[in-house]
Amino acid sequence: MRSKFKDEHPFEKRKAEAERIRQKYPDRIPVICEKADRTDIPTIDKKKYLVPSDLTVGQFVYVIRKRIKLAPEKAIFIFVDEVLPPTAALMSAIYEEHKDEDNFLYVSYSGENTFGQEGWVELPVDDMDKAFICVSAAKKHWVWVLCDVRSSYQNCVLIVPLVQRPVLHTHSSFLSVSFALLFV
């Protein structure tokens, strides 16, 4: 997505502003947040944010939701370089990995997974108990588990909607599928 902020402000001015901000507030991240094209989600009232470096992506999404007065039942997705970042990631880590050459972090948001691909991805699951945990956590998002019962559940495959890059987490030996911001 092309940034309107970049179109409206020359590179030298953006870079100088970001450097000034980083010098004055070294524990803050300069973020430009813009609505993605072709989405019916409300437009945010301001684009520039100084985000604490220890804020998580999920907490930042909460700030955006409040700024645009989005109803709790409505989905919101944020993208950095057209990728859904993990909600538990610190904004400082996202900044270090994805900051622009002008030293701003560009974030876009949408009511749909506009950069996701259509289709499905299969993920092998080695334990049926783990597979049921996945299904119970994400059943309203069309997650299915296919198992070959003739092989005593040894060949289970978790099938999930392809959301850019599905993220797998293992916590206490439980497998869970992160659907980025669907649960925020």
UniProtKB/Swiss-Prot annotation:
<protein>
    <recommendedName>
        <fullName>Autophagy-related protein 8</fullName>
    </recommendedName>
</protein>
<keyword id="KW-0653">Protein transport</keyword>
<dbReference type="GO" id="GO:0000421">
    <property type="term" value="C:autophagosome membrane"/>
</dbReference>
<keyword id="KW-0813">Transport</keyword>
<keyword id="KW-0968">Cytoplasmic vesicle</keyword>
<dbReference type="GO" id="GO:0006914">
    <property type="term" value="P:autophagy"/>
</dbReference>
<dbReference type="InterPro" id="IPR004241">
    <property type="entry name" value="Atg8-like"/>
</dbReference>
<keyword id="KW-0472">Membrane</keyword>
<dbReference type="GO" id="GO:0015031">
    <property type="term" value="P:protein transport"/>
</dbReference>
<feature type="propeptide" description="Removed in mature form">
    <location>
        <begin position="117"/>
        <end position="184"/>
    </location>
</feature>
<dbReference type="GO" id="GO:0031410">
    <property type="term" value="C:cytoplasmic vesicle"/>
</dbReference>
<keyword id="KW-0072">Autophagy</keyword>
<keyword id="KW-0926">Vacuole</keyword>
<dbReference type="Pfam" id="PF02991">
    <property type="entry name" value="ATG8"/>
</dbReference>
<dbReference type="InterPro" id="IPR029071">
    <property type="entry name" value="Ubiquitin-like_domsf"/>
</dbReference>
<comment type="function">
    <text>Ubiquitin-like modifier involved in autophagosome formation. With ATG4, mediates the delivery of the autophagosomes to the vacuole via the microtubule cytoskeleton. Required for selective autophagic degradation of the nucleus (nucleophagy) as well as for mitophagy which contributes to regulate mitochondrial quantity and quality by eliminating the mitochondria to a basal level to fulfill cellular energy requirements and preventing excess ROS production. Participates also in membrane fusion events that take place in the early secretory pathway.</text>
</comment>
<comment type="similarity">
    <text>Belongs to the ATG8 family.</text>
</comment>
<keyword id="KW-0449">Lipoprotein</keyword>
<keyword id="KW-0833">Ubl conjugation pathway</keyword>
<feature type="site" description="Cleavage; by ATG4">
    <location>
        <begin position="116"/>
        <end position="117"/>
    </location>
</feature>
<feature type="lipid moiety-binding region" description="Phosphatidylethanolamine amidated glycine">
    <location>
        <position position="116"/>
    </location>
</feature>
